Amino acid sequence: MIDEHPDRLRDAIVVGAGVAGLAAAGPLTAAGADVLVLEARDRIGGRLLGTSVPGGVVDLGATWYWEFEDRISTLVRRHGVATFDQHLAGDTVVEDATMVQRLPGNRLDVPARRYTDGAASVASALAGELPTDCVRMQDPVTSIDFPDPHRAVVSSRSGTHHARHVILALPPSLAVASIDFTPALPESLARLASLTPVWMGDVVKVVATYPTPFWRDQGLAGAAFSHRGPLQEIHDMSGPEGTPAALFGFARATNHDGDITTKIQRQLERLFGPAAADPTDLLVQDWSRDRWTNPPPNGETANRSLMGHPAYQRHFQYGRLHWAATETASQFAGHVEGALVAAERVVSTVQTALAEETEAAPAPSVEGKNT
């Protein structure tokens, strides 16, 4: 889509239509701000990704939230997003290099909530609060220029856009790898971003569906640890009342090469018996190879302690560039709750700035003439 108003000076442009981006855009538009959200994918939700299977939806991205996470708990109640308790009852299966053991009780899972219609229902609820023309998909941002202290010029597939503020709602390492900034970001900030890990960026998530949750009939929780792999941990992903019936697990992307489906089927059979060997569906989502989630390797080791770094709580480029991905959150970084924390912070900062700008002299035109 070509921008029909190329000279329009918006209040904010949000890069990314995951939870953080949508949660930032909502309150800003509700307060009367002119906001545009640019999303590289052909869908909203980012790492909230569900797929339909017979009997319901299974999650290939984020799965849980916890009731002590106040913002997501409030959001699902406010929007009527259906949720249910993670299944916990039953024993745990543990696998080492030579044997499989059954241990009494669930040693892996803790009380958590799941989304009946998949985690992407949260993104849909947030998007439902936005004007219909607010979000543009398949529109990756390639450069952000700050020609003067008053505005940003954002270039994307659809053209050039102008805004008073830019909100980066994508993983920091992806932002610095895929977007050219002028002036260049401070060297320390660019390095911080490049070393901040992408949550789930090194993970392969696998979902196996079945006609019934047969493991429950055997007194198993669907929870398993494995030191042999390829899946390192496994959980019950069945929907309410066990429908759809599913198990899901995580594997490190660095621990496999190519198609791992046969290895996974053999592992599931070792852990849960012959009934697990032939799932109805075996869905594999390799987040490490998702170009709009994880940047190409840069030869350096990411440092998880950098998530939520104090620098991300600040704004840059004349106070017009703001960080809002879950990796930047001061609390719950990596969770959906963290995305909401980051969005809340940025909304407050941008609203304050816009109010101050309204009280001050008018901003210059997009041609950059001073007033």
Go through each PLM region and give its residues:
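Conserved flavin/dinucleotide-binding core of flavoenzymes
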Residues: 2-7, 11, 20-23, 31, ...
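Short hydrophobic core segments
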Residues: 13-15, 38, 141, 160-175
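Glycine-rich FAD pyrophosphate-binding loop
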Residues: 29-54
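Conserved FAD-binding subdomain of flavin-dependent enzymes
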Residues: 45-47, 55-86
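Short beta-strand to alpha-helix junction loop
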Residues: 63-70, 107-125
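A short alpha-helix-loop-beta-strand transition element characteristic
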Residues: 72-93, 213-222, 277
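A conserved short coil-to-beta-strand element within the FAD-binding core of flavoproteins
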Residues: 137-152
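Flavin (primarily FAD) binding-site architecture
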Residues: 168-188
